[in-house]
Amino acid sequence: MPRASLALLLAAAARAAGVDYPDQGAQAMARGGAFAAKADDLTAIYYNPAGLAKQGGTRFLLHGNFVDQRLSFARAPRLDSGGAVQQRFDEVESTDGIYPVPFVAASSRFGLDRWTFAAGLYGPHTAGNRTFPKCIGVEANDSPDPCGGEEENYAPQRYLLTHQEFITAFGTFGAAYRVARWLDVGAEFQWAYSTVVLEKATNALGSSLPSSDVIIRLGGEDGKMVDRFTPAFMVGAIARPARGVEIGASARPPLTLRHEGEVDLTPSQTLQDSGVAISPDPARATLVMRLPWVVRGGVRYFREEQGFETWDVELDGTYERYSVVDTIDLEFEPSLQVDSEALGASTIEVFRDPNGWSDTWSARLGGGYAFRRVGPGALMLRAGGNYEAPTQPLDYTQLGFTGWKRFGAAAGAAYRWRGVTLSLGYSHLWHETREVTDTRFMTYDTVAGPPAPGQRCRDVEDAIHCTPIGNGTYRASIDLFAVGLDVAFDELLDRSR
């Protein structure tokens, strides 16, 4: 059981974090995510806490976003040392359904003129679950050889990913203060709770033969790796330098998640029969994942008539410093012991895997138009679009993380009556199709010597012991739906009407 091949686990685990899709909340999503300056509902605790100062009285928000994510991978044929095709692979697709992303928050001024306080709970706006087949044409079982041992029955993407669940919830406590008529500031404390489950395979001999597979499960057989508490913070400000103009900005410093739990490693029956053993079984480990600086900024222009906002347009930019997320670490305690009759014993204390991620930026343009009297209430129409630069270089492309270049278009509507607002939103994200021919993901055998950091299979001296597993065609398509309920209780209960 080569130590080097296990490092592929981290390549998949690292990308379980993903990036958010634009964007949280029914109003903001329908505007293409352009909300850093407007921030006039309780999703301000996600975009810009200074926006809480705009919201008087006591309020409640319950929004639900729903992510329909479709991923596919057509692995490139496996070639022999002379370049002849040894094996062709079927295209595989993710089998997940619609993933819900709830958002709940409440706020009150508690009778104070300048202060607003809020509390809420939400998660990243992304699909936390991704599932791909383990087997092709047969039902998977729970044995060390889940597809029966026949090579053609094993899914071609199994070395990248078969299943992952990455769930993070931010319990948030925030406050905003109106410094002056033209300036609001806000800050918040967040309690991050996170869980990880991941399953994939690696190969002990640098081939694609299932007889050499090792199945890896972060979270063990039935559990999860858990980080029960990591503190996070956010600050923001909104300025109104001229009539009808707002400028907003917010920043969240980086944070480090430390997921503790079991790691189960199951060698194939062939490897077990040949004397490969891994202990302890299951192992105990900590998966260390870093989340980057996130800085948002936006400027908007709006028009009001007798205190009622009739229309607005906003342009936002977001910067995420993913280059500082340089490694993902898996720390074993106690150390992992790998015994092999052929290769002897080795001890593993920590894997440290480089990411290759780059800083990324995005632009969001959106706005709304409101009709003051439609029946007993007001009707708001919203639309927007966005562009996001890639986080993930082409040679680091794989299935656990889709930080690719993408474009989005969105639209939605809302109806408000006596302090109660019902909102709907829809967005579609177009991802670039990625053709990868020089992947950094491979299986390899320490008998031949592992590649140095940054090498690919073409750099390995004895390439027969190195098999590229990430070359091929990657496609992604995302549909986002949102519904929302907002209640302003002071307006709802106003009996003077």
What do the PLM-derived regions correspond to, one by one?
Residues A11-A14:
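N-terminal signal peptide c-region/cleavage motif recognized by signal peptidases
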Residues A17-F35, Y99-R497:
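Outer-membrane beta-barrel porins/channels
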